[in-house]
């Protein structure tokens, strides 16, 4: 009986270690394309470091992720990019400067018409 218990404990530990290894997979980076009225916005999302990069006002911005009640929010306290589902907006100094952004399936595709996938 003692030998059976020892084998079970070893197998159980091995199973836990294998499952723990599965959670170490790093999320991939993504390039997201938005249509914001007549303006296109491209956002590079670095999931490993929880930040996004985008070009606004002729400047390359890198915004770290910050706490949000809902959606994903990135801010450097001057610029803010906030997305939820397939929609997003951009603020500068707490004023919305780009609104009504809809995620595109690819840069050349039509807008996802209000669908949350």
From Swiss-Prot:
A lipid is attached at residue 22 (S-diacylglycerol cysteine). It is a lipid-anchor. SUPFAM superfamilies: YdhA-like. It comes from the Bacteria. The record marks 70, 84 as: Directly involved in lysozyme active site inhibition. InterPro entries: MliC, MliC_sf. Disulfide bonds join 36-101. The keyword Endoplasmic reticulum does not apply. It is found in: Cell outer membrane. PROSITE patterns: PROKAR_LIPOPROTEIN. Belongs to the MliC family. Type 1 subfamily. This is Membrane-bound lysozyme inhibitor of C-type lysozyme. It comes from Yersinia enterocolitica serotype O:8 / biotype 1B (strain NCTC 13174 / 8081). The gene is mliC.
């Amino acid at each position: 009986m003692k030998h059976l218990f020892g084998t079970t404990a070893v197998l159980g530990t091995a199973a836990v270690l294998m499952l723990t290894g599965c959670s170490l997979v790093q999320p991939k980076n993504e390039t997201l394309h938005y249509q914001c009225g007549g303006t296109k916005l491209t956002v590079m999302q670095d999931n490993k470091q929880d930040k996004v990069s985008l070009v606004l006002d002729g400047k390359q911005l890198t915004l770290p992720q910050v706490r949000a009640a809902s959606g994903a929010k990135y801010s450097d306290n001057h610029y803010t990019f906030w997305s939820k589902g397939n929609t997003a907006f951009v603020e500068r100094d707490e004023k919305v400067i780009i609104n009504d952004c809809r995620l595109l399936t690819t840069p050349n595709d039509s807008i996802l018409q209000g669908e949350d996938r």
